[in-house]
């Protein structure tokens, strides 16, 4: 749909793209023997397409038409997300209104199919969640209806203790806590959108990640208390970070210095990920995609207003070692550092959360794939994972 939007926006012929999209929905309806006249709906929507078609409306139609087919297949009522998932004009989800509308729809129909990924402003215009936002919609629906469990069906059999593309035969995780999953999801374990966890976590609703292609596989269950297990639950990593290394003598005694530094990044709309510190140096780690256009301006502002010297370390990869059972266990950090040392991988950043739920190390991105594979093997050999 994004490709189609681009063609429409710039006046590039788009008939083949739309025919391919529409043909896929028609094929699914026919193969399942559905009575719904999806062709008529697709033709009606096609007539509205043009250069000024709202992008959010267009992009949301993928989920919309999928939900139309699913509701026909299951025999459940179709409820458009635009009618029940409401946003205020500043883009924030209107929890109270959405909860009321969802409950009213459920009370009226009993069984519902609601497309994910989008909702609507008070005036009816479509607003999208971020990419992967169908997970978020499902989570809020479970919350609004006080469900016992939120089953998220995807194309993998739950969560693995490391990326299967980088580690050899990683173990599947049977049970994991909400907090552990948020850490792993944020750091690159993209099975479930990290923003889909909090809505059900607040209510104690369990999440079960299942594989559509292997329905008998129990997958992974996410709960408040996942019980005992190995010290390390899983590892995940992400490339694309940049570190602004800020030097100034006696900065540790300068009240408000760190606040002033963070204010600079806030002014450019950049989220700060981590802040390792020393007596006369701090490192501000951010996503490079957020900072790329502002690097020189940030350096200039910090140096001119704070009297500091700034260097930049690009192409940084962060790897997170996550485990609810790491707290109070000695030797885990030593094992991690030893594994990297034995494999000739230099650690440039070390961060640990106060609750000892994670250990994050920063390395040169060129070693990212090898580092995760080595780390997984080493932790398993040590009996820590």
Spell out what each predicted region is:
Residues 218-385:
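A conserved regulatory-domain signal marking ACT and ACT-like small-molecule sensing domains
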Residues 156-158, 205-207, 211-216, 226, ...:
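Glycine-rich beta-alpha junction loops
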Residues 1-12, 209-226:
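Terminal amphipathic helices with adjacent charged low-complexity linkers/tails
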Residues 76, 147, 205, 270, ...:
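Short glycine/serine/threonine/alanine-rich loop segments
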